[in-house]
């Protein structure tokens, strides 16, 4: 990827030109100063634009660096997984290259054979490739399933953690809701108590207001009554006082008139006083009869104008003056008394006026108080109405709040019940998911153990197949030697026939010489143990471990691998179409049919040619050879047995089998790389056979076919691919004759001694308890 700083460089000139045009296009009022702070405006704008781009680039680079740091851990994990996958791929490629090399070698060998055998080998190779592809697909599917299961486990774990978090949040929310519900309940209780107190206070206030209204009405009525009574009393008093005032005014006027008269009389008397000083003594004597004098004075006063006599009149005047003096004194006393009464009346009048004024002021104050009380009564009534309305509104609000809180409480209880149901469902789902996770983990462990055991079994099979291939190669070398021996016999018989055709009398001599040297009863050169027929373990067992045996058969005593797919377990023919071994000895056949101890006459009879135009009968052809590696005995099979033709050597080797079997059981896994080690002894054996001999091809070796056996301790499935057809895939059919390598009519098959003891082939292998079956996909 290119650097981000290199991208804006080619466009910098264009940006500067555009900026210059934009600045030139601006009006003079909007143009910046020519030299802001001593710099031209274009440089400032360019620096600002460059700084903006630099900031953007810095932010982009910082974002990329942070993103790359976040991806470091992921890349490391992916690198680790990729390294593991690459290592597995390298191993698989190495195995594939080795298998391909072997397959090319097998193809080279098979190209030397007939087209039919090539077709059979190709079909088998295709079937094996198909099975390999199926197995690889199944392996990939299993890996995908394992990855999916791991992803499911991770998802389940994440879901489990999320559900735990949700449970914690839900528990917290439940606790908060419980606290809120408790607080709401306490608030509701407080509100109920407050409502009750408000109701009680309202009732008390209503009762107090009613009492106050009743008292106010009673006070008003009593005030009116008292006011009326006082007004009536004061009206009566005022009327009486008015009457007294009138009387007092009349008495005052009369007293004033009397005073005026008396003043006038006093003035007259004062005028007559000097005249009456002389007559004082006389007047002192006449004090006794005052009343009569007064009456007389009065009468004289009335008739004073009629007095004609002056001396008598003077006496009378003196008497009258004394009487007047006494009357004046009494009048002055009365006057003083009247003045005192008048003063008292004035005082009482003033007091009454003051009392009236006080009553008027009290009346005004009472009226003002009445007005004030009426206004206060109205205000209190208005307040009462307002308070009743306010309390009603508060009561309605509180009732609404109570209804809302009750509804909210009911909703919260419903939500709590729903949340509890959800929590119960979540706990049930958690338990089910935990059980599923445990089941998945157990299934994963089982599948891992199963595939590990299956890999071990496949490795054991591969090792057994490798051992079978080694034994097959040895058998090939033995068969080539047999073919060479049979060819030698054929050449000798041809020479014998030529001698018989030339000189029939030389039969006895040639029979004695030839029979002694080449009698079938004579020991075969193949019967002697050689270095090539000895036990041939794998290179790994030669270096590290003891002789490793085939662990496939549970108790079989064969001397070869237990695979029924072994190509040498079927019929193997030579170049002349004849089998490289005699017909197997049937336990129901006669001993003379074996051909191993037959006389030369019987051999000559068997070599009779059929008439021209007829083919060989089927009875002359040997039957299909049974597997010589299986046995009904309970000895383990393995390639470590010597290929000797004496039973004593076989029994000797069988004694050492249990120790090898125990060593093979102790080894759980075999290295797959050791399965592809080439055998250095094969070229020597192939060269020993001589040129001109075409070895039969080695078909790919298939594993043992295990049928389903429900009686065993473990249920076993059938094989993942069908068994090979008899006599066609691994060997030529009975009607097949390969081309002859010498001219002349074909000869009848002659009897030959079988180098291996006859052994029966069981139709099915017994199930092995330590083996798990192949999974069905």
From Swiss-Prot:
- Show the stretches that span the lipid bilayer: 39-59
- Predominant cellular place of this UniProt entry's protein: membrane
Q: Name one GO biological process term.
A: endoplasmic reticulum to Golgi vesicle-mediated transport
Please note every region of biased composition (Polar residues): 530-541
- Might you report a single GO cellular component term? endoplasmic reticulum exit site
**Which region ranges are annotated with the description Disordered?**
510-688, 721-742
Q: Tell me where it resides.
A: Membrane
Coiled-coil residues are 118-269, 339-494
**Membrane topology classification:** Single-pass membrane protein
Ranges of compositional bias, category Basic and acidic residues? 572-591, 649-672
Identify the keywords attached in UniProt to this record, alphabetized: Coiled coil, Membrane, Transmembrane, Transmembrane helix
Looking up Gene3D superfamilies in the UniProt record yields: 1.20.5.340
Q: In which family does this protein belong, per the annotation?
A: Belongs to the cTAGE family.
Q: What is this protein called?
A: cTAGE family member 9
Organism of origin: Homo sapiens (Human)
């Amino acid at each position: 990827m290119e650097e981000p700083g290199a991208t804006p460089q080619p466009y910098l000139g264009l940006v500067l030109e555009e900026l210059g045009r934009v600045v030139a296009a601006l009006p003079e009022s909007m143009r910046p100063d020519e030299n802001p702070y001593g710099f031209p405006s274009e440089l400032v704008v360019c620096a600002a634009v460059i700084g903006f781009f630099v900031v953007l680039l810095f932010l982009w680079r910082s974002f990329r660096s942070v993103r790359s740091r976040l991806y470091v851990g992921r890349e490391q994990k992916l690198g680790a997984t990729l390294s593991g996958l690459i290592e597995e791929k390298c191993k698989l490629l190495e195995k594939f290259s080795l298998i391909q090399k072997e397959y090319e070698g097998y193809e080279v060998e098979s190209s030397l054979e007939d087209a039919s055998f090539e077709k059979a080998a190709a079909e088998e190779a295709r079937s094996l490739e198909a099975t390999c592809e199926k197995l690889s697909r199944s392996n990939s599917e299993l890996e995908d399933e394992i990855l999916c299961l791991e992803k499911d486990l991770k998802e389940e774990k994440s879901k489990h953690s999320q559900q735990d978090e949700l449970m914690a949040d839900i528990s917290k929310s439940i606790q908060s809701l419980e606290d809120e519900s408790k607080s709401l309940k306490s608030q509701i209780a407080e509100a109920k108590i407050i409502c009750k107190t408000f109701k009680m206070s309202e009732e008390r206030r209503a009762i107090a207001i009613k009492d106050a209204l009743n008292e106010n009405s009673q006070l008003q009525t009593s005030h009116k009554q008292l006011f009326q009574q006082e007004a009536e009393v004061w009206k009566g008093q005022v009327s009486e006082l008015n009457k007294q005032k009138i009387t007092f005014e009349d008495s005052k006027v009369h007293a004033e008139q009397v005073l005026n008269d008396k003043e006038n009389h006093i003035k007259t008397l004062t005028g007559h006083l000097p005249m009456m000083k002389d007559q004082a003594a006389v007047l002192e004597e006449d004090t006794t009869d005052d009343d009569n004098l007064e009456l007389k004075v009065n009468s004289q006063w009335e008739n004073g104008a009629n007095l004609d006599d002056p001396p008598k009149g003077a006496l009378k005047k003196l008497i009258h003056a004394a009487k007047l003096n006494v009357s004046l004194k009494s009048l002055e006393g009365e006057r003083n008394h009247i003045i005192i009464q008048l003063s008292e009346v004035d005082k009482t009048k003033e007091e009454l006026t003051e009392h009236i004024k006080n009553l008027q002021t009290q009346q005004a104050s009472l009226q003002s108080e009445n007005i004030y009380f009426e206004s206060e009564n109205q205000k209190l009534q208005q307040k009462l109405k307002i308070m009743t309305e306010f309390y009603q509104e508060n009561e309605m609000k509180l009732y609404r709040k109570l209804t809302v809180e009750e509804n909210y409480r009911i909703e919260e209880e419903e939500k709590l019940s729903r949340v509890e149901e959800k929590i119960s469902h979540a706990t049930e789902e958690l338990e089910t998911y935990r059980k599923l996770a445990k089941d998945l983990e157990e299934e994963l462990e089982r599948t891992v153990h199963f595939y590990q055991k299956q890999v071990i079994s496949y490795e054991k099979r591969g090792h057994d197949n490798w051992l079978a291939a080694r034994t097959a190669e040895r058998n090939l070398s033995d068969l080539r030697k047999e073919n060479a021996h049979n060819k030698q016999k054929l050449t000798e018989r041809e020479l014998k026939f030529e001698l018989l055709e030339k000189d029939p009398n030389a039969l006895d001599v040639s029979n004695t010489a030839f029979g002694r040297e080449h009698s079938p009863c004579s020991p075969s050169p193949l019967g002697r143990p050689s270095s090539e027929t000895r036990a041939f373990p794998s290179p790994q067992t030669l270096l590290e471990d003891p002789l490793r045996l085939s662990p496939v058969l549970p108790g079989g005593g064969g001397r070869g691998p237990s695979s029924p797919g072994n190509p040498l377990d079927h019929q193997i023919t030579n170049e002349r179409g004849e089998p490289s071994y005699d017909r197997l000895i049937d336990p129901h056949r006669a001993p003379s049919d074996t051909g191993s101890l037959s006389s030369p006459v019987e051999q000559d009879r068997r070599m009779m040619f059929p008439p021209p135009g007829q083919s060989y009968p089927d009875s002359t052809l040997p039957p299909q050879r049974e597997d010589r590696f299986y046995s009904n005995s309970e000895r383990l099979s393995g390639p470590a047995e010597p290929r000797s033709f004496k039973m004593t050597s076989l029994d000797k080797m069988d004694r050492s089998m249990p120790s090898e079997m125990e060593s093979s059981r102790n080894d759980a896994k075999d290295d797959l790389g050791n399965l592809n080690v080439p055998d250095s002894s094969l070229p020597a054996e192939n060269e020993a056979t001589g040129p001109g001999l075409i070895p039969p091809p080695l078909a790919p070796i298939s594993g043992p076919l295990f049928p389903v056996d429900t009686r065993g301790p473990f249920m076993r499935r059938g094989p993942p691919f069908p068994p090979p057809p008899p006599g066609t895939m691994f060997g030529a059919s009975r009607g097949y004759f390969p081309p002859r390598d010498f001219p002349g009519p074909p000869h009848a098959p002659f009897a030959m001694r079988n180098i291996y003891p006859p052994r029966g082939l069981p139709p099915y292998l017994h199930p092995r308890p330590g083996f798990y079956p192949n999974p069905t996909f």
